[in-house]
Amino acid sequence: MKTFSLAKFSLALLLLSLPFNFILTDGVGSVYLSTILIFLNFLIVVFFSKGQLIFKKEAFIAICVFIYFLLFTILNVLVSKGFLLKEQLIFSVIHLQLILVFLLGNYYSNYISKEVLFKFLFFVILLFSFRIFIDDWDKVFNLSSVRGFRVETIFAGGVNNFGLIVGLGFIISFFHLKKGMLKVISCLYFIIVIILTMSRGALFGLVITLFLVALYDSKGKILSSLLKTSFFLTVIGFIVLLYSNAAQDIALQFSERFLSIFSGETTIEQASSGRGLIVRDMYNNHIKNSSILEILFGHGMGSINYMVNGSPYESSHNFIVDVFYRNGILILLGYLALVIYLCFMFFKNRKGADLTLFGFFVFLHFEILVNPYVYAAQTGWIYGLFLAIFLNQNRLGHYKRKKIILE
């Protein structure tokens, strides 16, 4: 098998786990098809590439980081005499699959062009979004008003994660596809699907992404394209909703989810789904009681599991707070340094950077502040894939290298 074909096959296998994901078995926790495919994928690439996947500087660092996570997770389990053992084990697997996909993404970056990557992603995200209509057609217009109500909770890890993946499809449509009906139709389709999910994070994230990419674009073409496309999408969307039987329900739910805060019907606390309350509870009842070692090295990968207002939570719904509590302040500082480095590389390469990739970067990192999708067993691994691609895109001197994915 040729190396180039291996990379394409592996990427296709990885991405297709998104639309076709399901629970294989229940044991200590739910085992998803995507998790099995990630481990299988990794072993296949290691074998056929003769170890190229792991013999890289980035791979060595990533493996060391996971070993660091694992050591302090085991230490916390031993000190607590097995407390949260099941949760620590589950989230250790989630962290491991994130690391493995990062290693795979680092390998892909040498052999797959951005054109191939975007085509694969676009096709897979279409299939991913179609599944909600195929599996749960009678509930599509119920707008995910009840937690756990719709099928995307099973294969995507929740409504917000579903909206996140669909948002990536919109970014490809808007920034990568050439002018024409395909671009207009796909943009309109993805926006309508996001509105149906009522994911505020995904919708606001796209608005912020479009605005920041327009500012980032040194040629100034995105702003004019944004205004034109927005106008056509608004007109077409209005016509579709006007002649849709669900128009009234959509307008009512949209008003309640997105506009009620401005009318005073909803408080900021309610609009944020209680995120402020969760963080305050976490600080007052958990972080304040932490030892210096726990602050430095964390409480373990699966250490967040507590009740707030009678509801169970496995995340603070803020990735920065989660990393600090799970992995410690040292890892948090390292992660923030990595994000700052990526920002610096994007702006250093501004004239030649790909706007679609920058759109991914902005969107994923806005979402990570309000939606802890990284910790979803079904879809969180996608952050590892993009993190590897961002690192290869922004490496110094990447324009002179022949095998970098984004040349």
Question: What are these model-predicted stretches?
Answer:
Residues 115-142, 157-217:
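Alpha-helical transmembrane segments of multi-pass inner-membrane proteins
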Residues 39, 356-367, 374-407:
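Transmembrane alpha-helices of multi-pass inner-membrane enzymes
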Residues 141-142, 155, 266-327:
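Long extracytoplasmic/lumenal interhelical loops at the membrane interface
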Residues 59-71, 82-107, 116, 120-125, ...:
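Aromatic-anchored transmembrane helix interface
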Residues 2, 36-53, 167-176, 211, ...:
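Hydrophobic, aromatic-rich transmembrane alpha-helices
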Residues 241-281:
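Flexible juxtamembrane loops connecting transmembrane helices in multi-pass membrane enzymes
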Residues 1-50, 68-80, 364:
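N-terminal signal-anchor transmembrane segment
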Residues 51, 59-60, 180-182, 215, ...:
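Hydrophobic transmembrane alpha-helices and their immediate junctions
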